[in-house]
Amino acid sequence: MQTKKSSNLAIALIWFTAAISMAEILTGTWFAPLGWQQGLIAIVVGHFIGGSMFFCAGYIGAKTQKSAMQTVQISFGEKGSALFSLLNAMQLMGWTAVMIYMGADVISILNQTPDASVFPFLTLGLGILIILWLLLGFTKLGIFKSISLVTMFLLMLWLSIQVANKPFIAMDVAQNIKFGTAVEIAAVMPLSWLPVVSDHTKNSETPFKTTALSTLTYTATSCWMYALGLGAALVTGKSEISQILSLAGVSVIGVLIVIASTMINTALPAYSTGMSLNNIFPQLKVTPISVITVIVGIILASTLPVTEYEHFLFFIGSVFAPMIAVLIADFFVLKQHDVRKSVDGVGLGVWFVGFVLYRFLMAKGWESDLGLTFPVIIITFILAILVRKITK
């Protein structure tokens, strides 16, 4: 049976859609204490680091025509990769909660007299819409998604013009941020997509071109969203999405556009959670797990301060940075392209060393101007090659 090939444009649009996100704009606001110039440099440097790993993961999938989790099996074994499917499901649940919270926060603009007691009902209402979207088969409703994408793009373009035409003001911030930390936060966003990028590049007829286009599209758009958040925070002096949109004069129509886009983007991590858990437990159906993920997201968004998710981002970095380092060493240097073991103890052992190193350095407060991801990847990469050669 011949596999259907995906066009480069279609794949690029997937990553363009993924990057246009309230979560990325909010994360960009954290860079405001650095100022515009230093904040922008941190955004670009971080995305270059994370985007490079994004490219490597996508290219491996495109060359081998394997899905993301199938490529992970190359380094960690068929059953060993289940660990990363589980960790991926956990991070996707976290993103689902963050997106639901932000969507509800945007809806609150419509309420002229803000009331905290109403917020749980807003998260519930948005969650129900997302569940209906999943049950209707969100992967098939292309026209609605296309309209939402175009209108969201126009709204972000309008917001960018608003930010560019206004002067920066002093921002009241409770905490400062180091340059290295900012680079790390920028690098982690592309890393969070490593467990799914190959799912979209594996059917390409032009592996390098497709992966390069996907990487460029996502990283450039993500940089735009980060920069928009940074600029909006410097212009308004605020760091909450609802306040930024309100001060920018976003109308009811604009709010509805954001809600529609948030609904679509939130369905993606929820559905991917079902796919990840289905890889571990085939008896589990994807759609019911996706619905449960949204329900968990509603609860988390209503009860936890999910917008303070710096540690969540660092968790993603600590898991997926050493993972991709081992995979890059095996595939590009050691030329290991096939699954050889059920559980690859060497690969898992090296990954664990990288994971512990990341957490240890973070706990000690150590960081370079390039963050933690870059040095951890380099060390894990070298260690993987040495240990593989010794244990061969």
Which stretches of residues belong to each language-model region?
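Membrane-interface loop-to-helix entry segments
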Residues: F121-V163, V173-A174, S214-Y218, F314-A325, ...
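Membrane-water interface regions at transmembrane-helix termini and the short interhelical loops
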Residues: T29-P33, Y59, D105-T113, G125-S148, ...
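Membrane-interface "cap" regions at the ends of multi-pass membrane proteins
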Residues: M1-Q38, K178-V183, P195, K202-K209, ...
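Transmembrane alpha-helical segments of multi-pass small-molecule transport proteins
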Residues: L13-A19, S85-A89, N111-L136, S148-S160, ...
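Juxtamembrane transmembrane-helix boundary signature
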Residues: V44-F76, L83-Q91, R388-T391
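Extracellular loop-to-transmembrane helix junctions
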Residues: T29-G58, G80-A82, Y218-A220, P375, ...
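C-terminal membrane-solvent junction of multi-pass transporters and transport-like membrane proteins
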Residues: A174, A325-I390
